[in-house]
Amino acid sequence: MTGLELLYLGIFVAFWACMVVVGICYTIFDLGFRFDVAWFLTETSPFMWSNLGIGLAISLSVVGAAWGIYITGSSIIGGGVKAPRIKTKNLVSIIFCEAVAIYGIIMAIVISNMAEPFSATEPKAIGHRNYHAGYSMFGAGLTVGLSNLFCGVCVGIVGSGAALADAQNPSLFVKILIVEIFGSAIGLFGVIVAILQTSRVKMGD
């Protein structure tokens, strides 16, 4: 087995071991009623969900941008050894990857500005509006984070191909750049959907 297969096997075994231990503990101490999704959703604070949305928006976007820059940058450096002329104009691909992280920062700021304090502590007093706001912020953060993650990988792979194609044939650069622009639009779609998800959100007393 390779190291990666051992890692996946270890994660799989650890996950199911934790599930078995939790199940046994809930059975022994008669806490099976707590193994309930509705109980979990109503007993957690809407602030937790909104902050999770903020964290996912920025962290997944940064991972996508870093991954794309890594893929593109390694190809630019490698191709630049044989064709030094590609180093400057292929930095456009790096800028496209960096824009993915900027999308995440913008959405994280938008979500954080919507989170308002409220005084209630009981689930009934918190109200449906605050729960809806927390879940919507979480969903928006997850939407923009995942879309930017895959957008960064997409732009990185296309940018890598653009750099290597440009090193071989300079006339191919503009054609592949158009493909890269369409790939970068994926992240923008995620931002638009996330803004729509949080457009009617109101949190507070």
Curated annotation (Swiss-Prot):
Keywords assigned by UniProt, alphabetized: Cytoplasmic vesicle, Hydrogen ion transport, Ion transport, Membrane, Transmembrane, Transmembrane helix, Transport
Tagged with keyword Cell membrane: no
Protein's gene: Atp6v0b
Marked site positions, Essential for proton translocation: 98
Entry keyword annotation includes Ion transport: yes
Listed GO CC annotations: clathrin-coated vesicle membrane; endosome; membrane; proton-transporting V-type ATPase complex; proton-transporting V-type ATPase, V0 domain; vacuolar proton-transporting V-type ATPase complex; vacuolar proton-transporting V-type ATPase, V0 domain
GO molecular function: P-type proton-exporting transporter activity; proton-transporting ATPase activity, rotational mechanism
Disulfide bridge partners, by residue number: none
Cytoplasmic face residues: 25-51, 112-137, 197-205
Principal location: membrane
Role summary: Proton-conducting pore forming subunit of the V0 complex of vacuolar(H+)-ATPase (V-ATPase), a multisubunit enzyme composed of a peripheral complex (V1) that hydrolyzes ATP and a membrane integral complex (V0) that translocates protons. V-ATPase is responsible for acidifying and maintaining the pH of intracellular compartments and in some cell types, is targeted to the plasma membrane, where it is responsible for acidifying the extracellular environment.
Subcellular locations according to the entry: Cytoplasmic vesicle, Clathrin-coated vesicle membrane
Annotated TM spans: 4-24, 52-72, 91-111, 138-158, 176-196
Record's signal peptide: none
Stated family: Belongs to the V-ATPase proteolipid subunit family.
Membrane topology category: Multi-pass membrane protein
Known tissue expression: Ubiquitous.
Protein name, per record: V-type proton ATPase 21 kDa proteolipid subunit c''
Origin species: Mus musculus (Mouse)
GO BP: proton transmembrane transport
Subunit field text: V-ATPase is a heteromultimeric enzyme made up of two complexes: the ATP-hydrolytic V1 complex and the proton translocation V0 complex. The V1 complex consists of three catalytic AB heterodimers that form a heterohexamer, three peripheral stalks each consisting of EG heterodimers, one central rotor including subunits D and F, and the regulatory subunits C and H. The proton translocation complex V0 consists of the proton transport subunit a, a ring of proteolipid subunits c9c'', rotary subunit d, subunits e and f, and the accessory subunits ATP6AP1/Ac45 and ATP6AP2/PRR. Interacts with IFITM3.
Lumenal side: 1-3, 73-90, 159-175
